[in-house]
Regions:
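Charged, amphipathic alpha-helical oligomerization/scaffolding segments
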Residues: 56-59, 63, 87, 91-94, ...
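N-terminal signal peptide c-region/cleavage motif recognized by signal peptidases
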Residues: 22-24
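Short, solvent-exposed, charged loop/turn and helix-capping segments
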Residues: 95-113
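Helix-rich interaction surfaces within compact, conserved domain-sized segments
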Residues: 102, 113-161
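Amphipathic, heptad-repeat alpha-helical segments
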Residues: 68-75, 82-85, 89-96
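Immediate post-signal-peptide N-terminus of mature secreted/exported proteins
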Residues: 29-80, 159
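Bacterial N-terminal signal peptides that target proteins for export
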Residues: 2-14
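Non-transmembrane, amphipathic alpha-helical segments
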Residues: 45-57, 77-84, 105, 112, ...
Length: 161
């Protein structure tokens, strides 16, 4: 791993821990660090197959899915308390930081994962604001669905809704 890569991971994780206000800066830094030419903006399969995963990614996505699944009925009924949305956002941020810090994906799979990470971070930021909390949760649920559809993680349990 290069010094630049280690420094990027340290900065990214620290930034996540300090504030979600830096989501756009984090996303721009992530895109700059992993720029492999043309930016990918929509999910794609790997020549018709799902992308490979690593253990940290599987673990982090499972924890995010479990946290959302525990509250999905209240999210759908629009009865989830704001403090629960904030707690969910915190768990998402923790797990995203973990998957970034421990990422060992090949570059093409990593580029696809960045689309999901962007949606997770955007959703978690929205969940911290009462006026957009439910929409943020829906964005996270959609990101989890994309993970299930595009990454080969046989242990992953998508959100039941």
């Amino acid at each position: 791993m290069t010094i630049k890569s280690n420094l990027f991971k340290c900065v990214a994780v620290t930034g996540l821990a300090l504030s979600l206000g830096s989501v756009s800066a984090f996303t721009m830094a992530a895109e700059e660090e992993h720029d492999h030419g043309q930016a990918i903006t929509e999910m794609q399969l790997n020549n018709g197959s799902k992308w490979g995963i690593d253990a940290p990614l599987s673990q982090a996505m499972a924890k995010i899915s479990q946290a959302i699944n525990a509250e999905v009925e209240s999210i759908h009924a629009d009865t989830l308390a704001q403090e629960n949305y904030v707690a969910l956002a915190s768990e998402i941020n923790t797990q995203v930081a973990y998957m970034i810090e421990n990422c060992e994906l090949e570059p093409a799979a990593d580029a696809q994962l960045h689309i999901i990470i962007h949606d997770l971070m955007d959703g978690s930021a929205s969940m911290e604001n009462q006026s957009s909390a439910r929409n943020g949760a829906v964005k996270v649920i959609n990101a989890l669905g994309n993970y299930a559809n595009y990454f080969d993680d046989p242990k992953f349990q998508p959100v039941a809704h």
